[in-house]
């Protein structure tokens, strides 16, 4: 099974202005080619599956990250030259974005690809309105995430899901031989990851209905911290949080979570608990229940279907 790295790409836009006569025409280098869609002439089973998925769901379907691999000529020695375009799931148009890279193991059996599509249609897509569906899905067997600093790649995690601007990648090796319970649990985790990212990307004004309740505490130290699990969680609950602050997988006492972590915690709560369950569990912490209701409404407004 081949492994591929998706590297962080530096995107530079270069604009050259030259004088043109009325007879001059402008033509892009490879006009009107949709790299996410299988070609109209493709008749193999994988291409047919991809195209059918797009027409049925509105999202493109990929099974590897290579969008383009075409010969563009030869060099002086006669060696073929290729133009390559890779899908960079982690690419974000922001200079301060955390740099990450992903290593994929591809699905190689058509039956596994079909199973992945069935999983999407059965457990994921029914919950996602048009605004929440990604531009494309990249279905693979396994994902390994790396952080990148000064061109040094450090192992980070093996996520089930990687959410990007142009694609959401899903690792489906866990589905091999899985029963309905495992399918549902896997789908729940994927939906939490996907929706946490979608919510965090919303404008501050839209998020304010949720963030206003704990905004003054985000990523700040507790005024009078406690250094045991129970007392630390009391500090969190009193400020409207349902989890503590973690860094590199370790819990830090006396520090409040970040906004993004708070969003992820409440997205999970909104997707997995009923109002009655939350009201009972956090009966002494009305701010938590209010934030739960605000998050459910946010998700509904974005098009989530409970």
Model-flagged regions — what are they?
Residues 1-6:
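Positively charged n-region of N-terminal signal peptides that target proteins for export
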Residues 10-13:
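Hydrophobic helical h-region of N-terminal Sec-dependent signal peptides
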Residues 15-19:
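C-terminal motif of bacterial Sec signal peptides marking the signal peptidase cleavage site
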Residues 21-117, 281-306:
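Acidic/polar, low-complexity intrinsically disordered N-terminal segments immediately downstream
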Residues 110-165:
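Auxiliary, metal-adjacent structural segments of Zn-dependent hydrolase domains
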Residues 150-181, 283-305:
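Structured domain cores in non-transmembrane regions
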Residues 167-216:
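Active-site recognition of the HExxH zinc-binding catalytic motif
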Residues 216-306:
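Metalloprotease/metallohydrolase-associated module, dominated by Zn2+-dependent proteases
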């Amino acid at each position: 099974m081949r492994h591929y790295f998706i590297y962080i790409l530096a995107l530079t836009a270069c604009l050259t202005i030259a004088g043109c006569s009325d007879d001059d025409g402008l033509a892009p280098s490879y006009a009107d080619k949709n790299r996410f869609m299988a070609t109209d002439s493709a008749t193999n089973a994988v291409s047919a599956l991809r195209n059918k998925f797009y027409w049925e769901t509105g999202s493109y379907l990929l099974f590897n990250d290579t969008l383009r691999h075409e010969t563009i000529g030869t060099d002086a020695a006669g060696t073929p030259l290729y133009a390559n375009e890779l899908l960079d799931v982690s690419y974000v148009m922001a200079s301060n974005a955390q740099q990450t890279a992903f290593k994929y193991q591809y699905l190689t059996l058509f039956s596994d690809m079909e199973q992945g599509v069935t999983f999407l249609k059965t457990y994921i897509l029914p919950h996602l309105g048009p605004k929440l569906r990604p531009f494309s899905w990249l279905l693979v067997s396994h994902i390994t995430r790396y952080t990148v600093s000064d061109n040094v790649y450090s192992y980070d995690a093996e996520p089930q899901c990687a959410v990007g601007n142009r694609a959401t990648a899903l690792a489906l090796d866990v589905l091999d031989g899985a029963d309905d319970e495992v399918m549902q649990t896997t789908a729940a985790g994927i939906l939490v990851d996907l929706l946490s990212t979608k919510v965090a990307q919303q404008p501050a004004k839209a998020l304010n209905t949720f963030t206003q309740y704990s905004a003054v505490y985000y990523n700040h130290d507790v005024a009078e911290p406690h250094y045991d699990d129970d007392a630390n969680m009391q500090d969190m609950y009193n400020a409207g949080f349902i989890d503590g602050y973690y860094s590199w997988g370790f819990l830090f006492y006396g520090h409040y979570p970040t906004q993004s972590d708070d969003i992820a915690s409440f997205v999970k709560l909104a997707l997995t608990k009923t109002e009655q369950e939350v009201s009972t569990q956090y009966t002494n912490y009305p701010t938590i229940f209010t934030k739960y209701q605000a998050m459910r409404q946010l998700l509904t407004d974005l098009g989530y279907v409970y």
